[in-house]
Amino acid sequence: MTAPPTNPLALIAELTHRCPLHCVYCSNPLELTARSTELPTETWSSVFQQAAALGVLQADFTGGEPLARPDILDLIKSARAAGLYVNLITSGLPLDEQKLTQLVESGLDHIQLSFQGADADTAEEISGTKSHAQKLRALEWLKKVRVAVTLNFVIHRRNIDQIDEMLKIAESSSAARIEFANVQYYGWGFANRDSLLPTRAQLDESLIKIKAAEERLRGKIRIESVVPDYYAKYPKPCMGGWGRKLMLITPSGEALPCHAAKIIPGLQFANVKDQPLAEIWHSSDAFQKFRGESWMQAPCNTCDRRTIDFAGCRCQALLLAGDAAATDPVCTLSPNRPKIDVVLAAINSSTPEI
């Protein structure tokens, strides 16, 4: 058994898979959890208490759309009572000004508002819902309450040319942080990859604009940018490394090391309804599976980067190499890197439609 290097720092509370949006890159599984199997309020409250005792500092409320939970105010209160910093990741569609005030009064520390584009047409094309005007209204309401704000712009081929317009939206808001996060290609993102992955020219131009904005807004707005894995030389340490920093609880209570872990065949996931959180973190089969280095194959097992990127994303290795224990194929040292290069060659020579 490989002991975790630390206790988890954050708990990702996936409260529900229900969502008013139908984004073509959604990271939720292709088979969603039914409302009838969602954890009740009291179970989540117990999870928050156990998480705090385990050393968790922050609870990230996500989904789906976490505001679809009628008990969202009670959940925020429970997490705050446990001593956790509470972050809400939302589409903003279920919000109104009164609801926002109630969320903050219940103890909400931070809100991340997602945007699918810089204009209504792009947002509707991607999400399948008329949502953009509501998000802009939410930005105005956020100016009136004391809560930290991050704007999440999910970047892909269809909106990457709108970076300047996205920055204008952010600069007119109360946000202290912007995240330009390129789509991660698993779940629905993988299914629609050929229509979403930007071209090299698009990516390079966007990075120039983001770099200039970082300099111009330094000290005012913090900007973070996550580039597509496919264009990287080395893989990122997915989730900070398998079972190292984060723990995700699904709507039905399964504990996962990462969002997409359920696609890996043969893994059995413990449920918070049946086992204590600490036991799951320290000794459950799923969290043990790719923790440490003993499972690594060549070239990772002798590579100097094995303690930096931990062989990359296990789910990406499965999707592209057919083996969850393989080197992440985005790595230039991976024997499967040519598969990535074939995808990039096609992307950079065509204009596919969603």
Per-range role (PLM):
Residues M1-T2, A232-K236, K289:
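Short, P/G- and charge-enriched loop/turn segments at secondary-structure junctions
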